[in-house]
Amino acid sequence: MKKIAIFAKVHDPRALAVAEELIEWLAARGVTAHVEEHLSKRLRRTTLAESSESTEIAADADLVVVLGGDGTLIAAARLVGERDVPILAVNLGSLGFLTEITLNELYPSVERCLAGDFEVSERMMLMASVERSGEVVELHRVLNDVVINKGALARIIDMETSVNGRYLTTFKADGLIVSTPTGSTGYSLSANGPILHPELECISLTPICPHTLTNRPLVMAADAHIAIKLKYAPDESVFLTLDGQVGMKLLSGDVVQITKAAHVTRLIQSRSKDYFEVLRTKLKWGER
């Protein structure tokens, strides 16, 4: 691997310290690290690394190393986009369902990556677009979830939902979560959505506080084309949030279209633990 990109949580002193150590470690092995410009400005020793815009780094990296939590990883995954570059995600955060590599595993894992000795877990992504008056006004790639929800003081919202052109129902709820299997342990889980193994290919729909108690979470095939039309937006205080990081206000009549993305996120797996161990640890199963 010739080009290794490092993304770190720039406001976390621990992540910055680890980034500096990793840059030196790579330089000692003849490998130049590439970092984002805003990260480079926060590092004390930058002569051993090259810096440029985040999109440029992601465009031709052979490996992406993420230092932080799940949010840092999700942002990096969207930047990598269509290139299917392997991502080594190191957990410096708190919960960390996605960043399963521990700090103790960092250097042995990078060593194996340099030697081409690693395994990846391929995670399905979604494409989400917003149509307004017949025109696409937003288009984004999503790793975790697409969320439609109302403002704090708004009333219930009506979301006319169809799958593959066939009417499903009109959800009357505080919102609706459309999630990948990877995102099933995020906001969807908090709304009583199902836990889906991350290597499955499917899409879940989970209403948030539905008016009708029989509106339960649904799991759709991965090739489902989901269309959600906002029938009623009280005081126009309805928002679309993508991966909890990108958002916009929705208007009555807007249509959110969601399909499976053509590319996946490739996460390098830990050699010391499997997905079920991560679930047990993070959700504290078996504890009293």
Swiss-Prot record:
Catalytic activities: NAD(+) + ATP = ADP + NADP(+) + H(+)
GO cellular component: cytoplasm
Compartment(s) of residence: Cytoplasm
Protein name in the entry: NAD kinase
SUPFAM superfamilies named in the record: NAD kinase/diacylglycerol kinase-like (SSF111331)
Binding residues for NAD(+): 70-71, 144-145, 155, 172, 174, 185-190, 245
Molecular function as annotated in GO: ATP binding; metal ion binding; NAD binding; NAD+ kinase activity
Pfam families reported in the protein's UniProt record: NAD_kinase (PF01513), NAD_kinase_C (PF20143)
Cofactor(s) in the UniProt record: a divalent metal cation
GO-annotated biological processes: NAD metabolic process; NADP biosynthetic process
Residues the record marks as active site: 70 (proton acceptor)
Enzyme Commission code: 2.7.1.23
Job description of the protein: Involved in the regulation of the intracellular balance of NAD and NADP, and is a key enzyme in the biosynthesis of NADP. Catalyzes specifically the phosphorylation on 2'-hydroxyl of the adenosine moiety of NAD to yield NADP.
Organism field: Citrifermentans bemidjiense (strain ATCC BAA-1014 / DSM 16622 / JCM 12645 / Bem) (Geobacter bemidjiensis)
Keywords from the named record: ATP-binding, Cytoplasm, Kinase, NAD, NADP, Nucleotide-binding, Transferase
Enzyme class: transferase
Stored InterPro entries: ATP-NAD_kinase_N (IPR017438), ATP-NAD_kinase_PpnK-typ_C (IPR017437), NAD/diacylglycerol_kinase_sf (IPR016064), NADK (IPR002504)
Keyword Lyase: no
Family that this chain belongs to: Belongs to the NAD kinase family.
